[in-house]
DNA sequence: GGCCCTCTTTAGGGCCTT
């Protein structure tokens, strides 16, 4: 079951509530960010009406016959996915059991795996064009995915992810300043009362977290102080080194998926596909390295740590 | 950019992220 925010609005929110889990229903029903989407939709033709915000991936020319077929032709701009209903399985059972055994931290911590697609590799000049995240505990409405409108910044690496300017530079695709409060609401909906969030990304310290911090700063937001940032790449390197000390095995997400014989859903270098894969890889890594939740917390960074390093580098 | 490795440490190349 896959629910897009635009579909929620189209269906009338109050009648939709009974089918949602309570937390997500609560923030959707009361969300000011949803009003933002409505205003934006209304501004397209000056009429106040709900619209479905889909972006067609059907393309003409060099790319994407393959991609379009894989993605099913269209994808919603922003959506929260009921992964539990979609997969009919508990994909992270082992980690859930381990979290449950850690009685103190498991009551406080929400682990969310994330991935970004961007207009390029430069941390300062490029922009985010797609975000996906998944609460590793699974359950209903645990997954978030959205395209992001980068404004005037051109996409020069569409050959990597297949996302082109004409797909995201559209009025119905939210800009980052509109999206941040929506993303914050999603994270809050997964958060335990008075708890902390561990955001996991592959090569996050050098890439994803720097992009997020820059975008939050640009839009006059701060990364919440109860967020911990965990880079899964050092875990992968440590694990692969322990597997084969004399030969340097690749620690890329793709190589890890091959090593663990994991199947990818969707296309590589699309945020949701990478998040679903990293969620599985992350679980395998924590098991192989015998890392407790406490161990993981000790390996986390804070946004202020990374911001300070970025500022130091900027001066240098 | 940050990290790791080595033919290193007063450095440089490769990996990983898009």
Swiss-Prot record:
Gene3D superfamilies according to UniProt: Ribonuclease H-like superfamily/Ribonuclease H
Nuclease listed as a keyword: yes
Binding-site list for Mg(2+) 2: 115
Domain Exonuclease: 112-282
Transit peptide (residue range): 1-63
Binding residues for Mg(2+) 1: 115, 117, 274
Disruption phenotype: No visible phenotype.
Reported effect, residue 236 to V: In dpd1-1; loss of activity
PANTHER family: LD40940P, THREE PRIME REPAIR EXONUCLEASE 1, 2
Subcellular location, record wording: Plastid, Chloroplast; Mitochondrion
UniProt superkingdom: Eukaryota
Gene Ontology, cellular component aspect: chloroplast; mitochondrion; plastid
Designated name of the protein: Exonuclease DPD1, chloroplastic/mitochondrial
Family: Belongs to the exonuclease superfamily. TREX family.
Function noted in UniProt: Exonuclease required for organelle DNA degradation during pollen development. Plays non-essential roles in maternal inheritance. May be part of the DNA salvage machinery.
Regulation: Inhibited by free nucleotide diphosphates (NDPs).
Note: DPD1 homologs are present in flowering plants but not in moss, green algae and animals.
Cofactor field: Mg(2+)
Active site feature: 269
One GO MF term attached to the UniProt entry: nucleic acid binding
Disulfide bond sites: none
Free-text tissue specificity from the UniProt record: Highly expressed in mature pollen grains. Detected in flowers, senescing leaves and roots.
Keywords: Chloroplast, Exonuclease, Hydrolase, Magnesium, Metal-binding, Mitochondrion, Nuclease, Plastid, Transit peptide
This enzyme's EC code(s): 3.1.11.-
